[in-house]
Amino acid sequence: MAAEPPALRLRPPGSTGDSPPVPRLLGGCVPLSHQVAGHMYGKDKVGILQHPDGTVLKQLQPPPRGPRELEFYTMVYAADCADAVLLELRKHLPKYYGVWSPPTAPNDVYLKLEDVTHKFNKPCIMDVKIGRKSYDPFASSEKIQQQVSKYPLMEEIGFLVLGMRVYHLHSDSYETQNQHYGRGLTKETLKEGVSKFFHNGFCLRKDAIAASIQKVEKILQWFENQKQLNFYASSLLFVYEGSSQPATTKANDRTLAGRFLSKGPLTDADGLECNNNFHLFGAPPNGMSVGKSLSKAYSRHRKLYAKKHQSQTSLKVETLEQDNGWRSMSQEHLNGNVLAQLEKVFYHLPAGRPEIPEAEVRMIDFAHVFPSNTVDEGYVYGLKHLIAVLRSILDS
């Protein structure tokens, strides 16, 4: 079993100091604020909880599902595990910290897991069920019929979006979609439906798509090289950073935005380089609208970025889609509080970083994992189709 979890932030990812108080439950735990799928707190199930130390608590399901998932985590994270396949699998799972029970209810058992979102400021989260079948080999005919009726296209598509939570820059808020959104996607609307997860209200986050593809491809590689386990009704949890700047840089950005709009213009010679090499030149010349001035500054920033990184062959973070998002923003969204809008522009810009952004893709939900001696063709099929859809979005 893994060591004790590190001390994590007290507030849920994406929350603010003005967030309403969260009800405290067993042992000081609170409902997981950023859960996008599964049993939710406040309904017929207790849902996923967050422990005061920052870990996630998943209540053990009734037999045989709960004991089966516990056995899976215990096997993979056994201290004496020497199986290369399982050791490699750990890289794609949330860290497991054993089981936990509240002092007042010792018979209630919870899996204690890493909160994959803890390092993100504004985490965008999507839960995608993988595989051509969402029922296991021992399911009854009634169970099979029930699962097939929920999403008849599962066999053909190979995955199902169970929920998503996307941070929108322009409103500083989250948009959420539940399982009904995913079940409503057809072969014709699947690409657009998945791309919604990567759109921040200004542009399509192709950098996050590319980073996610890399993670999924590593999981696919693991599945293609193992014949020990088959997974049913299991999911991938996607997470990427919705805010392009850490919270600690916002004060600096506000100062920069203020100087841009101040009466004392910055000359070309006074070009600023702040935070992650974002270049800003000059205040709006007399007679030039703020929108046009911003477009000009952005154009110069892009030219400098292209010149600086033209020899690099890494993935291009800035795209035509982002250009269009900029033009739309500069023409339509600069009414009212110009300073506030300008700050959002700074967060939106890629800031000249050539590296791949922070993103996570982890496997979750293991109540239907079974020993096998063959490649898990259903899961592999789903992964390959998901990668194909993501690549299609990236290349569009």
Curated annotation (Swiss-Prot):
A motif (Nuclear localization signal) lies at residues 300-310. SUPFAM superfamilies: SAICAR synthase-like. GO terms for cellular component: nucleus. Residues 1-13 have a biased composition (Low complexity). ATP binds at residues 58, 114-116, 127, 365. Pathway: Phospholipid metabolism; phosphatidylinositol metabolism. Binds two Mg(2+), but the interaction with the protein is mostly indirect. The modification Phosphoserine is found at residue 19. It is found in: Nucleus. It is an enzyme of class 2 (transferase). It comes from the Eukaryota. GO terms for biological process: inositol phosphate biosynthetic process; necroptotic process; neural tube formation; phosphatidylinositol metabolic process. The modification N-acetylalanine is found at residue 2. It catalyses: 1D-myo-inositol 1,4,5-trisphosphate + 2 ATP = 1D-myo-inositol 1,3,4,5,6-pentakisphosphate + 2 ADP + 2 H(+); 1D-myo-inositol 1,3,4,6-tetrakisphosphate + ATP = 1D-myo-inositol 1,3,4,5,6-pentakisphosphate + ADP + H(+); 1-octadecanoyl-2-(5Z,8Z,11Z,14Z)-eicosatetraenoyl-sn-glycero-3-phospho-1D-myo-inositol 4,5-bisphosphate + ATP = 1-octadecanoyl-2-(5Z,8Z,11Z,14Z-eicosatetraenoyl)-sn-glycero-3-phospho-(1D-myo-inositol 3,4,5-triphosphate) + ADP + H(+); a 1,2-diacyl-sn-glycero-3-phospho-(1D-myo-inositol-4,5-bisphosphate) + ATP = a 1,2-diacyl-sn-glycero-3-phospho-(1D-myo-inositol-3,4,5-trisphosphate) + ADP + H(+). One of its GO terms (molecular function) is inositol-1,3,4,6-tetrakisphosphate 5-kinase activity. Belongs to the inositol phosphokinase (IPK) family. Inositol phosphate kinase with a broad substrate specificity. Phosphorylates inositol 1,4,5-trisphosphate (Ins(1,4,5)P3) first to inositol 1,3,4,5-tetrakisphosphate and then to inositol 1,3,4,5,6-pentakisphosphate (Ins(1,3,4,5,6)P5). Phosphorylates inositol 1,3,4,6-tetrakisphosphate (Ins(1,3,4,6)P4). Phosphorylates inositol 1,4,5,6-tetrakisphosphate (Ins(1,4,5,6)P4). Phosphorylates glycero-3-phospho-1D-myo-inositol 4,5-bisphosphate to glycero-3-phospho-1D-myo-inositol 3,4,5-trisphosphate. This is Inositol polyphosphate multikinase. It comes from Mus musculus.
